[in-house]
């Protein structure tokens, strides 16, 4: 059984309004026992923070090296976490560590929850899948519509 804990990660100072909307929707729709907002350097102010600061069960947790202990990886994830620069790559490693050690449901800060996860929590595990999207670099090409046609049209 999966713990009724939602985990969000934010690496950076300004927590956005959209992140606040994501966490607020998860809280109101799913009603988890706890919500972890694991962060690095996040300021507890601004529009996003104002939306979540009063949520019952919200735990604002700074990233710690101890999150990476006990992964049976000889410290590789922790070393990579401190070596990598891209926030998305660092968040991937942190997500792996948190779910492995503590369990729960990880959600990105751009996910709007519209239905509770109660049935999914009864499973040993689950994963969400997003539809295939066009790469961002495509729209920087000389004629993006040509690529759009090739990728999307039958």
Question: Across the structure, where does each feature detected by a protein language model lie?
Answer:
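GT-A fold catalytic core of metal-dependent nucleotide-sugar glycosyltransferases
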Residues: 86-134, 138-146
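Short internal beta-strands
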Residues: 35-41
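Active-site-proximal specificity loops/subdomain of glycosyltransferases
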Residues: 44-93
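Short amphipathic alpha-helical segment that frequently serves as the phosphate-/nucleotide-binding helix
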Residues: 16-24
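Short, acidic, metal-binding catalytic loop of nucleotide-sugar glycosyltransferases
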Residues: 23-33
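N-proximal low-complexity "stem/linker" segments adjacent to membrane-targeting elements
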Residues: 1-17
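Acidic-and-aromatic substrate-binding clefts and catalytic sites of carbohydrate-active enzymes
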Residues: 14-17, 41-45
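Charged, glycine/proline-rich intrinsically disordered loops and linkers
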Residues: 73-74, 78, 142-154
